[in-house]
Amino acid sequence: MSRLGSRRGSRRASIDPLRLIPMDKAKAPAAGEDFNVVFIGAGNIMFGSPEGPWNHSFRFEHKLGPRLKVVALIDPALDRAAAALQKKRDSFVLSAYQDTKMYKTIDDFARSMTPEEKPRAIIVGSPPHWRGTDLPGRDLELKLLQYFPGVALFVEKPVSTGPYTTALDIAKKIEAAGNLCSVGYMLRYLKAVQMMKQIIEDKELVVMATSARYVCAYEAITKPDWWDKSRDQGPVIEQGTHFCDLSRYFGGDVDISSVMAHSVEWDEEPGHLSKIGVDESKIAPENRIPRVTTATWKYENGAVGTLTHAVSLHGKNYSCELEVYLDGYQMRLVDPYHIPTLYIRRPGDDYEETYRFGDDDPFFSEASRCFQLD
């Protein structure tokens, strides 16, 4: 592998951090023709939750302004969809939702769609159990390619809870079809992350090691499926893949044969938790989630990586860090979900420079760039 290939890691070039504008400082949306969007899923990821800052509808409303027209909201729970729509219609974004139609399935919408309702983008926020495979009822992406050729897709992570080989096949089919597709790993869009990436490119550095730590505050997590491995596949899939993706963004592709992992299980003494917000006794013992997972691996270029995910904190705030090591450099990203802070130690000095990005919103930056809406 060339030094350039090693340096780029994920092969994605950096974005100038100065171009990542906070939502409250962005220019007013430019006038233009309607931008039709379909929302799939009427849950927390699409319409917000006290648990965290995710809320895709909010970001697209502010990015597109009066151009946004949500032509369809797809969710089998029509009562939940209706409640979400009513809140929007009672607010300042009425124009985006006043003509929104509700459907239980994407098939229902495709059958009734008029030419005027054809979407330019589809936002997928449904649970991963129902997508990412080629099995009937769990083959959403394949149906989207069939019904909406060429339409841009935004798919929330995780992309699948099925076999990873099948998920890779689905990804190849999306690429072959030519649909622009973005996945909701928004931490790549942090100004701090792009500053790290820019330094690596400008100094022509090669990553030696990455070390990721993701410790969640579990007390506020009250969705039963989250605690059930048979439903949401556990916290590494639900949360830890954010840092797996970020690690790959710097280190590049992983030698899968080198991955080793250990975990603290629910029935081991260190795995006792005192403030679980669901009745775990209703979950089969074999489906209860691990409390701590650690993994190590080698990247294909020879660098090494580690990940620790823990379900251990009370309160609301998570404790998350990513460290990247290079010749002469240590870069430490701290608290990426709240006030992203970057600590940099450079060659020839023991001092750590500190950069805080209190006004950053990677969700908005992602929404702005994934469909080239600038």
Residue spans of the language-model regions?
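Conserved acidic residues
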Residues: V71, R120, M208
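Short amphipathic alpha-helix with an adjacent loop that forms part of the alpha/beta core around
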Residues: I106-P119
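Beta-strand-loop-alpha-helix segment that lines the small-molecule cofactor/substrate pocket
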Residues: A121, P127-R188
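NAD(P)-dinucleotide binding in Rossmann-like oxidoreductases
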Residues: A284-P290, E300-R369, L373
